[in-house]
Amino acid sequence: MNNRSKQDNQVDLLGHLGNSSKYMIQHHHRDNLSEFVLHDLCSEQGFKIRKAAYLINNPDFNCLKGVAGFYHPEIFPGMVWQNPKDFTSHMLKSPFNQHVRSYTDTSLPAISSKVFSKKELQGIVDYLEIEDAAYHTWQSKHNNQGLFIFERPQDVIVSQDHLYNFLHMLSFCPVF
């Protein structure tokens, strides 16, 4: 891919993701806002991630909870932000999303502020059946940590820094 195409892809991606904050404000009352944001993040217009899970690690309550899941074969066929009721119904029927949401365990002990035990993470990856898994963690509100486990995209068109920076948007979503 030539340099101009990479720049075009980055401009398109950042334009797409830039709209997310506007949509998040418009739909702030939705309990499942994290599903909307995750869908945006992983879609063809986003980072083209085939399978991903968003979890919250809460050391204060010794709890690790699955919040939202995305799996490309179960993708919503319309525009999620323009069809919020249909999207919400769709996600309630999404087997992978429900599988992620059903995940509950004790809190992951942090080796450092950004690193969890590979053994602990591998158990989650196996449960979620994510191939060629990568993960990223970040500090969230109320002393929680966000945990994003995803299947590495085949075509890495944009910098992972963009992905990791955008993941913080999930911290603004309610956990339901």
Residues of each region from the PLM?
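Regulatory loop-to-helix N-cap segments in sensory/regulatory domains
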Residues: M1-K6, E131-W138, G146-F176
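Helix-loop-beta substructure at the N-terminus of cytosolic sensory domains
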Residues: Q26-F76
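Regulatory sensory and allosteric helical modules in signal-transduction proteins
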Residues: E74-T137
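Hydrophobic, Leu/Ile/Phe/Ala-enriched alpha-helical segments that form helix-helix packing faces
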Residues: S21, V37-Q45, L170-P174
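Terminal helices and disordered tails flanking the catalytic cores of nucleotide-processing hydrolases
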Residues: N19, P59, S112-V115, F172
